Amino acid sequence: MAFVPKTLDYTVSPYTGLTRQSWIEAGTYLLEGVFQNIAHFEDPVVMPRKETKVTYPHSADAVWEFKAEYFEGLARSFFIAAPLIHDNPDLNLCGYSIRDYYKSHVLRACTKGDPVSVGRYEELQEMAGDYNRAFQQTVETCALVICLWVCKEEIWDTYTKKEKDVIAEFLRGYADGNTVPQNWRLFNMLDMAFLDMEGYEIDEEIMLDHAQSILAYYAGDGWYRDGHSFDYYSCWAFNVYAPIWNLWYGYEKQPYIAAKFEEHSNKLMETYADFFDRDGFTNMWGRSNIYRNAATSAFDGNLMLHNSTADPGLARRISSGSLLQFMTRDDFLFKGVPTLGFYGQFTPLVQGYSCAESPFWLGKAFLCLHLPADHPFWTAIENNGTWETLGSKDTKVTSLNGPALCFSNHQANGETILRTGKVVKNKKDEHGMWNYSKLCFNTKYPWESAVASDIEAQQYVLYDGVSDEIKKGNVTYWHGLKNDVLYRRQFFNYDLENECHWIQAINLADFTVPYGVIRADKLRLFSCPIRLTLGSYGFPDNGTQIIEKTADGAKAIILKGHDHTGREKQMAMTIYDGWDELEIVKSTGTNPDSENSIVIYAKTAREKKYGYQPYVLISQVITKESLEDFTDDEIFPIEKVHYTDTKKCGGYGPVTITLKDGTTRTIDFEGIEGQLIR
């Protein structure tokens, strides 16, 4: 059953109607789902498990994994519970005092020998037999200390000195212990900052080493590099934990680093609101998408700073819009608990480091409830930022060279499209390519997994006739935006064993139109024969009308239908020069919105090894949230294509595309070779 808010106020919240009380109702709704699965007060937060092949615990004898699962359930659900406990210490759900439950289980989790102990750091080292290993528990200690801070008066302050010492000793092992050299360093930093704040001695050299490392991961534009990739960890980790660290430790003891963290968060706020669409929807992109609207927690992180620049009315509008995106769907929960998916259960999305309780990381979005009722986040009138300034067919494009992110806000359909670069994935990591290597990510068309071995949504797939292999784009270099055209290069089956000239590739060039994106990509092949396909977005198939059209040598397929919620959907894909055919493929179990789906795909082939054959591939995908017909000019927008080369293959020189509305875009790959960044 979907969440339905009881409290609505369209005066202060004209877009969503949600208020602070609405958020309390939403948090209570989620906690009721948790506690309906807890049979006895003594039982840990272990939830019903729907998926068993990918997620952990992976085997019945993996004791440390069960302990990690206990801790994930406790600490992540505490994200939701802590602000509710602070707001209402007498909260009682399913017959349990929520304050008493978390007070008891936090202490028990930290107590050696207790049946629900999650394992001290030293115990796990001995159990694993690896003294250089980091453990999942380190992640959860950070959630624990944040929540103990949020409801400090109700839980932490009520422990005896002896009980506090037990918890502090437990935390110290992870605070000083091994971590992963990426966002995990912030977990250790907050553990130490909490201990320091509560009067316990810490190793300040360890703190400073982690802090300087985090600072060094900064790539610009408010984004941090996490591992190799850029993703929402920059938002729900770096730009949430760093502001909290500033409050607890940095402003007082490391003012230079704290000032930098503040500067970076404020830089993110300059553009981050435009990462979401007109409805406040979060885009399905990057790993750990089961955390869903946790992406909005970066706004709350910024509002904690001494010199915050976030627009509170816009921040709440987006946070509430994203909350409704997920919680109002009838497939969001499994037995009262958020599924391992983006909407309903969707296994292609799930990583092996997750368990049934992992989705409660979305509880970070509820940390905004720590802001008092009179805070501007709750009192400012909702506004919709960029969307209030765009004309009916306007598109705003933001390109960030630091993290290699280009996102466009399309007023015509209310969608936001993300195009990314600096992507490096192993050529066998199909899952990683779905998360990062799609050519476009759309807030209203979440990415589709493989519908066939040689067809992918929003990806090129190349069959190499020489090696007899199907190859996919696992590495994407970034050049950036030039004269309204975004340039990138994608390699197929990139590896370090071969120089790049021995790897099949395609130069990417794309630009926005009101309802989507036009592509004018150029093949960069070292050998033929090859076959190539390019898929549209995945389209939810709940009864779909399929229409085919042709005009002036171009071909289009239009799909009309509805998504799982009944929302009207329409998509059209059009092919021009360089392509041979346009077809559809139907699929089951590959779409995160609906069980059945359709992908439109273009296909072509190149046979002659060194033939001067068409190099440029021109196509368009447009979408709208309506069954109202696209106009012919929207489906077939190109008036003419002018080539520099006399054979009109696009082998050299600029290619100029003139649209029927008079817009011209010049595609010119000259000069990008020396300015490609990964």
Set out the residue ranges of the language-model regions.
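Low-complexity, Ser/Thr/Pro/Gly-enriched N-terminal "stalk/linker" regions
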Residues: 2-72, 100-105, 114-115
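Aromatic-lined, polymer-binding surfaces characteristic
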Residues: 70-71, 79-91, 95-300
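Carbohydrate-active enzyme catalytic cores, enriched for enzymes
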Residues: 113-126, 167, 277-284, 290-428
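Composition- and surface-driven signal marking solvent-exposed, interaction-prone regions
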Residues: 256-257, 287, 311-318, 375-382, ...
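Low-complexity, glycine/alanine/valine/leucine- and proline-rich hydrophobic stretches
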Residues: 387, 391-476
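Extended repeat-based interaction scaffolds and adjacent low-complexity, acidic/S/T/P-biased segments
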Residues: 440, 454-678
